[in-house]
Swiss-Prot record:
EC number: 2.1.1.-
Name of this protein: Ribosomal protein L11 methyltransferase
Gene3D superfamilies recorded: Vaccinia Virus protein VP39
Organism: Clostridium botulinum (strain Alaska E43 / Type E3)
Keyword terms, alphabetized: Cytoplasm, Methyltransferase, S-adenosyl-L-methionine, Transferase
Gene that produces this protein: prmA
Length: 313
């Protein structure tokens, strides 16, 4: 590799940050960094309000976000850029605003990569009680705070996105000490880890992506939890038994595909917490939930995104 890394960037909208980050993790990037000026501007000032520390992004406030991914210098740059452009176009075809949608790339020295990508991640309060911190940062919990430790360069899900925060808030509200929780499309494992830290009897994370599965397992290890398991595969194919709560932070189209399986994986009266739903897709998801025997209890909003909590009748 000769000490060289590839940086691929997409200049996009705040709405498209999550799906574009997902593209890069699907391409097995070694890390993803997000520059979102609006995220900085909408948070209360304080020592834990900064999800990333590059103040220069404020120069672009409200204009655009930038999602950066890092790949080995030995990877096929032309192929990575081509696939990224194709996937960004697919996101646009789903009705998600991609903003400028410009894909750029550069080669950078290894020492620049090693120092630069980590500066974007600092300890962050995702609820009043739960703090997410990267593994290399020190943090002393206050009062009854729960700290989730992550290596955010390994798989999607760092806790900084609106959809993740809303899912964690819902888990905080509904997880009980005898709860069994399934996290579908677990990515980094952050939601399963949150459920386990909140006292769930058992949390199971499942993902189709073997890279995500390995990442989630490593993050579970960082948090020293024994009430959590990470599995590779489809929900009903790999999980036995039923859950009290199923959580899925994905996109509306996939939620609709999963809903019938989720109804079979839940105990009667169980909850389906789901996010990754833009405003234009809320009616589609709630209709599918109703069709599959769910009663919608909550529709929570944060920015461009929605989180739905539904109860199996």
């Amino acid at each position: 590799m000769n000490g060289v890394w590839i940086e691929v960037r997409v200049i996009t909208s705040c709405e498209a940050i999550e799906p574009i980050s997902g593209i890069f993790y699907g391409l097995n990037s070694q890390g993803v960094a997000v520059e979102d000026p609006n995220d900085l501007l909408t948070r209360d000032q304080g020592p834990l309000t900064w999800d990333f520390a590059d103040i220069n992004v404020l120069e672009h406030k409200g204009e655009f976000a930038v999602v950066k991914a890092y790949f080995s210098g030995d990877d096929d740059l032309e192929k990575i850029v081509s696939i990224t452009k194709e996937k960004v176009k697919e996101i646009q075809e789903m009705g998600i605003d991609i903003g400028k949608g410009i894909v750029e790339c550069d080669k950078i020295k290894e020492e620049d990569w090693a120092n630069n990508w980590k500066k974007y991640y600092k300890p962050s309060n995702i609820t009043d009680r739960i703090v997410v911190k990267p593994m290399w940062e020190e943090y002393l919990p206050k009062n009854e705070e729960l700290v989730i430790e992550l290596d955010p360069g390994m798989a999607f899900g760092t806790g900084t996105h609106e959809t993740t925060r809303m899912c964690v808030k819902a888990l905080e509200k509904y997880v009980e000490h005898d709860s069994t929780v399934f996290d579908v499309g677990c990515g980094s494992g952050i939601l399963a880890i949150a459920a386990a830290k909140l006292g769930a009897k058992l949390a199971l994370g499942v993902d189709l992506d073997p890279v995500a599965v390995e990442s989630a397992k490593e993050n579970v290890g960082l948090n020293d939890l024994d009430n959590i398991e990470i599995l590779e595969g489809n929900l009903l194919d790999v999980i036995d038994g039923k859950a009290d709560i199923v959580v899925a932070n994905i996109i509306a189209e996939i939620i609709c595909i999963l809903t019938d399986d989720v109804s079979k994986a839940l105990n009667k009266g169980g909850l389906f917490i789901t996010s990754g739903i833009i405003h234009e897709r809320v009616d589609m998801v709630t209709s599918k939930l109703d069709e599959c025997g769910f009663e919608v209890m909550e529709v929570n909003k944060d920015g461009e995104w929605n989180c739905i909590v539904a109860k199996l009748k």
